[in-house]
Amino acid sequence: MSTAANSIAFVSSDTADAKAALESLSARYGQCSVAEAVVVVALGGDGFLLQTLRDTMGTGKKVYGMNRGTIGFLMNEYRSGGLTERIAAAVAETIRPLEMLAVTSEGETVSALAINEVALWRQSYQTAKIRISVDDQIRLEELSCDGVMIATPAGSTAYNLSAHGPILPLDAPLLALTPVSPFRPRRWRGALLSNKATVRFDILEPEKRPVNAAADHTEVKAVTSVTVRESPTATATLLFDPNHSWNERILAEQFRY
């Protein structure tokens, strides 16, 4: 991919390290507006990168992240030199977000996109009770739990992994359905679903056992039902250095201990 320095927009999180990197790189390579850019370089952590991907989704712009945050699993290593060459050699990965359609106890309908996961969790000390349907067929009549989520391959190494869900290769046509602290059924540990599946969560006893939902950082309180599917139209493009590709990161993560 050929990328001139004058077609790069630099954006950063609010941390001191990220702002310093923004100032340094803008002075060195120039600064293009996001609207006119071919590539957006995101400086920060994984959370800021997800925000940048959401902001540029559907525009055709490519996002290249450099780590000025903490973990930076989705980020490339920060180096100020040779940036245009690194971007030109980068491997592009297409990410399809999830679409969440949530209905609240007041009858409000809220839709949002999630690159990582759509998660539901109990709002109070009461255990959540949730019915799970896949493609209009009830698969779990009642899940008693702290929460449950649907994760994309891109999000499988985040909240999903911390809840003991599976790590998915980015090109796997799968979604991870993962419970959080399940109580009953005791032996149910989740499922792998086709990325073409539509999943519906119905909250049982919503007044007694209120549940919140979130598509990444978009939170909806007191939901009665949540429907999730992979978006058929929205896409985002993430760039990785070829020697540190997404598949290599996923493989390495599975051997960490």
Curated annotation (Swiss-Prot):
<feature type="active site" description="Proton acceptor">
    <location>
        <position position="46"/>
    </location>
</feature>
<dbReference type="GO" id="GO:0019674">
    <property type="term" value="P:NAD metabolic process"/>
</dbReference>
<keyword id="KW-0547">Nucleotide-binding</keyword>
<comment type="function">
    <text>Involved in the regulation of the intracellular balance of NAD and NADP, and is a key enzyme in the biosynthesis of NADP. Catalyzes specifically the phosphorylation on 2'-hydroxyl of the adenosine moiety of NAD to yield NADP.</text>
</comment>
<keyword id="KW-0963">Cytoplasm</keyword>
<dbReference type="GO" id="GO:0005524">
    <property type="term" value="F:ATP binding"/>
</dbReference>
<keyword id="KW-0520">NAD</keyword>
<feature type="binding site">
    <location>
        <position position="154"/>
    </location>
    <ligand>
        <name>NAD(+)</name>
    </ligand>
</feature>
<dbReference type="Pfam" id="PF20143">
    <property type="entry name" value="NAD_kinase_C"/>
</dbReference>
<protein>
    <recommendedName>
        <fullName>NAD kinase</fullName>
        <ecNumber>2.7.1.23</ecNumber>
    </recommendedName>
</protein>
<keyword id="KW-0418">Kinase</keyword>
<feature type="binding site">
    <location>
        <begin position="157"/>
        <end position="162"/>
    </location>
    <ligand>
        <name>NAD(+)</name>
    </ligand>
</feature>
<feature type="binding site">
    <location>
        <position position="146"/>
    </location>
    <ligand>
        <name>NAD(+)</name>
    </ligand>
</feature>
<keyword id="KW-0521">NADP</keyword>
<feature type="binding site">
    <location>
        <begin position="46"/>
        <end position="47"/>
    </location>
    <ligand>
        <name>NAD(+)</name>
    </ligand>
</feature>
<keyword id="KW-0808">Transferase</keyword>
<comment type="similarity">
    <text>Belongs to the NAD kinase family.</text>
</comment>
<dbReference type="GO" id="GO:0046872">
    <property type="term" value="F:metal ion binding"/>
</dbReference>
<dbReference type="InterPro" id="IPR002504">
    <property type="entry name" value="NADK"/>
</dbReference>
<dbReference type="GO" id="GO:0005737">
    <property type="term" value="C:cytoplasm"/>
</dbReference>
<dbReference type="GO" id="GO:0003951">
    <property type="term" value="F:NAD+ kinase activity"/>
</dbReference>
<dbReference type="GO" id="GO:0006741">
    <property type="term" value="P:NADP biosynthetic process"/>
</dbReference>
<dbReference type="GO" id="GO:0051287">
    <property type="term" value="F:NAD binding"/>
</dbReference>
<keyword id="KW-0067">ATP-binding</keyword>
<dbReference type="InterPro" id="IPR017437">
    <property type="entry name" value="ATP-NAD_kinase_PpnK-typ_C"/>
</dbReference>
<dbReference type="InterPro" id="IPR016064">
    <property type="entry name" value="NAD/diacylglycerol_kinase_sf"/>
</dbReference>
<dbReference type="InterPro" id="IPR017438">
    <property type="entry name" value="ATP-NAD_kinase_N"/>
</dbReference>
<feature type="binding site">
    <location>
        <begin position="116"/>
        <end position="117"/>
    </location>
    <ligand>
        <name>NAD(+)</name>
    </ligand>
</feature>
